[in-house]
Amino acid sequence: MSDAVILRSVKKFGEDNYGFESSTFYNNDKNSGLQDERKGDSSQVGFFQLFRFSSTTDIWLMFVGSLCAFLHGLSHPGVLLIFGTMTDVFIAYDTELQELKIPGKACVNNTIVWINSSLNQNVTNGTQCGLLDIESEMIKFASYYAGIALLVLITGYIQICFWVIAAARQIQKMRKISFRKVMRMEIGWFDCNSVGELNTRFSDDINRVNDAIADQMPIFIQRMTTSICGFLLGFYQGWKLTLVIISVSPLIGIGAAIIGLSVSKFTDYELKAYAKAGSVADEVISSMRTVAAFGGEKKEVERYEKNLVFAQRWGIRKGIVMGFFTGFMWCLIFLCYALAFWYGSKLVLEDGEYTAGTLVQIFLSILLGALNLGNASSCLEAFATGRAAATSIFHTIDRKPIIDCMSEDGYKLDRIKGEIEFHNVTFHYPSRPEVKILNNLSMVIKSGEMTAVVGSSGSGKSTALQLIQRFYDPSEGMVTLDGHDIRSLNIQWLRTQIGIVEQEPVLFSTTIAENIRYGREDATMEDIVRAAKAANAYNFIMDLPEQFDTLVGEGGGQMSGGQKQRVAIARALVRNPKILLLDMATSALDNESEAMVQEALSKIQQGHTIISVAHRLSTVRAADVIIGFEHGTAVERGSHEELLERKGVYFTLVTLQSQGEPTANAEGIRGEEETDGVSLDNEQTFCRGSYQSSLRASLRQRSKSQLSYLAHEPPLAVVDHKSTYEEDRKDKDIPVEEEIEPAPVRRILKFNAPEWPYMLFGAVGAAVNGSVTPLYAFLFSQILGTFSLPDKEEQRSQINGVCLLFVAVGCVSLCTQFLQGYAFAKSGELLTKRLRKYGFRAMLGQDIGWFDDLRNSPGALTTRLATDASQVQGAAGSQIGMMVNSFTNVTVAMIIAFFFSWKLSLVIMCFFPFLALSGALQTRMLTGFATQDKEALEIAGQITNEALSNIRTVAGIGKERQFIEAFEAELEKPFKTAFRKANVYGFCFGFSQCIVFVANSASYRYGGYLIPNEGLHFSYVFRVISSVVLSATALGRASSYTPSYAKAKISAARFFQLLDRQPPIKVYSSAGEKWDNFQGQVDFVDCKFTYPSRPDTQVLNGLSVSVRPGQTLAFVGSSGCGKSTSIQLLERFYDPDQGKVMIDGHDSRKVNVQFLRSNIGIVSQEPVLFACSIMDNIKYGDNTREIPMEKVIEAAKQAQLHDFVMSLPEKYETNVGSQGSQLSRGEKQRIAIARAIVRNPKILLLDEATSALDTESEKTVQVALDKAREGRTCIVIAHRLSTIQNSDIIAVMSQGIVIEKGTHEELMAQKGAYYKLVTTGAPIS
């Protein structure tokens, strides 16, 4: 295929020539997009590219914000100038006092002199005195502090406010542009990018970019300004000491940078592991009925836990690195103190180059510079995370779609006949390039005709329909419409000419009327009613309480398969399309409904092209032309009679299907609460591009094996009127999250009890670390006090002693910081893992009715597992360390402060609440501004999820723009909120920064009063103020976790509520009756039942029917009569409200749940497969033991699956993809049958078990099922008479009761409801 020639893009604007290109080039172009997507992860975007969406206004906001951040950064070095001068004033004053205390010295004429006994003055000393008014000096310095406080308040407010507003504006654009771009992508791109990852990109990744460009940016500028100016001030004041200190400072900066980078890396690994665990949880909870039916709870908990272990390891490593490097930095800082004061005091005392104030200025300037340089690394972490997140977002934004559904390019034909032709089309899906689906396909579909396409599973029928819609482009050849290559036509225009109805139709979470209106935006209510009547949907809609305003639930979950299909047909008919594509469109309808729909289709056939993929004889026979497919090629074409005479593919299919059918129209028995229609032979064999791959998430809210009505889902605002969501929320009784009492801390700690040794050692480390700050204040003030001593040797001795203490404190800090970091990381991660595991286990142990509750949707539960478990650490883990640290800090600081000056301590204590509050506010600011309006963003997230999960349907009906508009409308609320929050946060940040200067201003002013009036030593003033101010800010940082603490208690309460809940049907309980000789006798005794989520709808109304061991019972009846509900009662998904289900004479309520389910095997119409290998999916049939490979192969052979599996490259190790998306419907169904067979159950439940198979496969599988039924009790729900006519008992149900029962012959003889159903296909009333 390397140099095969293909036709491509033949009619573009400005050119009429037919261009020829090498398919190699085109295929490479296609695949390169996917490869680039993967490459994009390795090369991050440049930092300034983060601001690519900034406007002129944004640039001005950022410029002014940056200028204010620069001025704010200057304030700290400015304070050091004041502090150094003030230190010199204090020392000069104290030196004067010390000298005057010497006997024989006095102050005469502002000079200190010796006074001899004769009163003659000796003026050789010459030291000035009496000129320094310490109190007035302190007033001056206090005013300087107050002035800087005002500057910091204003600049701090502006820098944060302006940057946050600019970021909000840019993030708003980024969200809009990225969603618009994703909605433009071709379907092949979605095959290779999971919906879950894309949703994460819209939420988490964009939030991370926001963190990078919002408040972190001005804080980074501020810190860097402080850092640079600090170093410059140090060099200016004294280069010698600066060079000595600066030799150590890079190590501090490096340590801080390593922390930032390591934490970022480990967090990334940890999040990836949690994401995998989250995907497992989502898959399992979405498929809860299958998990319960096959007793997979324990296995799924183990699978979930495996991913949690990886996350735990990375979390602990992160704690170790943080603990070590935090200790390393503290150690370096204290060693730096020791070195600076030792060498600096030498320069002050011996060389006289510096004053003590200059020494303090230089030292604190360099320390301030290094610390701010290190702290800036936390911003670098946010920038790195933002860049990493932006890489995938920008790659998506910059990628050019191969098929751009919103492109204005291409022709729009004035008149369209609807003649479609395939010219030597070869095709493979982008996600499976090695599997050829269409192979040199050539066929003509004429206008005004109904063309039926038939063929076995995997022959390429539905793929051909997707190429007509231009979901994909052929690898070779071309598809033409009225002679025009469809690649030259405008894609939006093309799709408006096409109506599509799929076998598994997707309805959106809004009203029935709006769902039909999706077919045509300007459709009036009359048009909608007309279409509903044509689709035979009008009667059942009018029977609903709210008629056309009835909400269909997520994915149409409130409706049966037949009802959904009729609404989808109405949606297609309302647009009056020139081309109508029907992919098993009437498979879920009974004969009467189908006949009415076929009549409606025949009416519009004139001037329209109708292409139908079907295997019902009645559907196919009505076609003008039938085309037979085999191995991706059209092998025959003709009318029904012509093809029967030819005796080819069609003849084989008809022969197989007609065998055993007693009447021509005897297929109309259709199930009730079933999900979607008869799944036939979807051809995309083993390809993620299979026709159903985009439908999975919309069907997740109810497991494919559940065939009952579910709880109402909240609607989304993806309709023409943006207010619909709000109106619906007001009008409908949608449950809200109930208020919950916070959990007691004692119980949280009890849950963390196994880690008590780690917590104990961590608490010891935290206590020591808490004492370090007040100890620093003590030592620092002690050194300053020595400079006023008159004896130089005494000064030197005391300074050396204090320097040695600094070294000792540094070494201790290294150990205790590491101990605290490691111990609490270990205990916290183990707690999180335990909570997630127990929470997940408790979820899987709940009864199925619990999952029907809106609040317990898969999305809500997986979110609860992720967020609540992490939030519980807010009351345990590292938070305990923070609290112990702060408590020790404050206690030691208060002892020191009150010991040396209780009066000054009380004055500073007045600012304590403000200082604590400022610390809390500041810490909360620095954690980032990612707290957008949660509710509105969740709704926006629901819109993206619904749009992307159902992208094929959205693209097919051309509603991309409508989803985009709805998404953008939901973004307005958090966008407006961000402006308000920017002002609040800006003020809080400014206040948190300035309050320390205000406190210092008042404290030094009062200290200036106490020194002369009460004889307080100046070093005590420094000691008391430093101790209290530093401890207050530390307390503030601790109190900033109060919201986390409160959230933790609420999250823990939700967990404990889940753990404490006693489900009415206890899966994990070992209690209940078990017996050895399980026979399989089943008796339904006067069973009455309503679903917990729909208590006003009586589903079973006194069901009574029995089946003896080894017999087959078949349920038949119209939609909604309760057939599948009876199966759910037998599985004990629910218990009857009244009556009993008896198993071998035992009341099912008293039977052990796991024992009961282990003896039941089930095959559903839409089987749920898990994202693992074919072998593992088959083994899932029996989770009580390890199944040998021989048994797996044996089961596969019985299910007619083995040959297909062996034809795959990886055979039984082949991964089936998410929800089995890599397989066709027939292949999935056979895996499900093998899964049931390997279980070797005593009771076999077949719920439309062969409906998804083509006629050929069905016959072979039916033989396997007949064999599997031998010796087993079997309960069958089906609508093909060939499936049920040989049953021992046929029970005809209507409105929740059995109205007739007997064998096929007996019921036909009675000429009642069953006879009517068989002979006319009329529904049972």
Swiss-Prot record:
Extracellular compartment residues: 84-147, 262-319, 375-759, 820-894, 1005-1014
Residues of the ABC transporter domain: 420-656, 1082-1320
GO cellular component: apical plasma membrane; cell surface; endosome; intercellular canaliculus; intracellular canaliculus; plasma membrane; recycling endosome; recycling endosome membrane
Disulfide bonds: none
Membrane topology: Multi-pass membrane protein
EC number: 7.6.2.-
Post-translational modification: N-glycosylated.
Carbohydrate attachment residues: 109, 116, 122, 125, 375, 424, 440, 591, 889
Keywords: ATP-binding, Cell membrane, Endosome, Glycoprotein, Membrane, Nucleotide-binding, Phosphoprotein, Repeat, Translocase, Transmembrane, Transmembrane helix, Transport, Ubl conjugation
Family matches, as InterPro entries: AAA+_ATPase (IPR003593), ABC1_TM_dom (IPR011527), ABC1_TM_sf (IPR036640), ABC_transporter-like_ATP-bd (IPR003439), ABC_transporter-like_CS (IPR017871), P-loop_NTPase (IPR027417), Type_1_exporter (IPR039421)
Entries under SMART domains matching the protein: AAA (SM00382)
Stretches that traverse the bilayer: 63-83, 148-168, 241-261, 320-340, 354-374, 760-780, 799-819, 895-915, 984-1004, 1015-1035
Localization terms from the record: Apical cell membrane; Recycling endosome membrane; Endosome; Cell membrane
Residues covered by the ABC transmembrane type-1 domain: 62-385, 759-1047
Free-text tissue specificity from the UniProt record: Liver.
Binding-site list for ATP: 455-462, 1117-1124
Ranges per topology, Cytoplasmic: 1-62, 169-240, 341-353, 781-798, 916-983, 1036-1325
Molecular function terms, GO-annotated: ABC-type bile acid transporter activity; ABC-type xenobiotic transporter activity; ATP binding; ATP hydrolysis activity; bile acid transmembrane transporter activity; canalicular bile acid transmembrane transporter activity
GO biological process: bile acid and bile salt transport; bile acid metabolic process; canalicular bile acid transport; cholesterol homeostasis; fatty acid metabolic process; phospholipid homeostasis; positive regulation of bile acid secretion; protein ubiquitination
Record's catalysed reaction(s): cholate(in) + ATP + H2O = cholate(out) + ADP + phosphate + H(+); taurocholate(in) + ATP + H2O = taurocholate(out) + ADP + phosphate + H(+); glycocholate(in) + ATP + H2O = glycocholate(out) + ADP + phosphate + H(+); glycochenodeoxycholate(in) + ATP + H2O = glycochenodeoxycholate(out) + ADP + phosphate + H(+)
Subunit structure: Interacts with HAX1. Interacts with the adapter protein complex 2 (AP-2) throught AP2A2 or AP2A1; this interaction regulates cell membrane expression of ABCB11 through its internalization in a clathrin-dependent manner and its subsequent degradation.
Family: Belongs to the ABC transporter superfamily. ABCB family. Multidrug resistance exporter (TC 3.A.1.201) subfamily.
Entry function: Catalyzes the transport of the major hydrophobic bile salts, such as taurine and glycine-conjugated cholic acid across the canalicular membrane of hepatocytes in an ATP-dependent manner, therefore participates in hepatic bile acid homeostasis and consequently to lipid homeostasis through regulation of biliary lipid secretion in a bile salts dependent manner. Transports taurine-conjugated bile salts more rapidly than glycine-conjugated bile salts.
Designated name of the protein: Bile salt export pump
Biological classification of the source: Eukaryota, Metazoa, Chordata, Craniata, Vertebrata
Gene from which the chain derives: Abcb11e
